[in-house]
Amino acid sequence: MASHNSSDSTLDDTIMDGPAKLCGPKIFCIGAGKTGTTSLESLFKSLGFHVGDQERGELLLKEWATRNFAPIVSLGASAQFFQDMPFNCPFTFQAMDMAFPNSKFILSVRDDGEQWFGSLIRFHTKLIGKGRLPTAEDLRVFPYRYAGWILEALKLVYGVTDEEPYRKETLITAYERHNDEVKRYFRYRSESLLVINISDKGAAERIIEFVGLDYHDELMPHLNRSDDNV
């Protein structure tokens, strides 16, 4: 069992003190997919936070692309914790910061862009390509939110093309640019942003302290941090 005073626990063995009060600040996880957003969602659910409707958010991709933030702000008013698209897309964090003052932002990251790219490729190869790198046609017919949604997301958010939907340089550049823009935006407000690699020892303690919660020696449910599920 982990101890609050230890710096060795990760999101797998965090301890907590019951559910969080739902009257605190909103929390937006603005890291790219495959950086631990699923684990963070599980963490905040286990802490008692009201987690936003991910499907509803992902269906606002086209609104994000036209910078129509009104429906995204409306979704932001509906819960306390949010992750994945459109909240982790460029420009959304600024809109949420203005719409919901005193919110907390968590930028989840991997060790570097190469590691993030590898995780994305492995996940899509397993999920969509059934053992091979998906083609644009595979992405057009894959029924996630609707057929073609994943290809649209890759093109709109990361700037890839139909000809090269997994162009390494384009994807890594977009990933790193977003991270840099987030850190630059919050550079004078360290109380508002936590940059975290969830595989680091002590990550769970840092996250819980960042959102202002206390916890004691009660083991929290296991969180899956395998490479294919972050």
Please provide the spans of the model-predicted regions:
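Short, functional N-terminal and low-complexity linear motifs
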Residues: 7-10, 60-63, 145-152, 170-176
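Short, surface-exposed, charge-dense and proline/glycine-enriched linear segments
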Residues: 85-95, 136-145, 217-230
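The conserved 3'-phosphoadenosine-5'-phosphosulfate
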Residues: 56-64, 106-117, 138, 177-230
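Soluble or luminal CAZymes and related metallo-dependent hydrolases
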Residues: 85-88, 170-178, 199
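The identity of the second residue at the extreme N-terminus of proteins
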Residues: 2-3, 230
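Conserved short-loop catalytic and cofactor-binding motifs
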Residues: 28, 166, 170, 195
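PAPS-dependent sulfotransferase catalytic domain
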Residues: 3-171, 181, 188, 192, 202-213
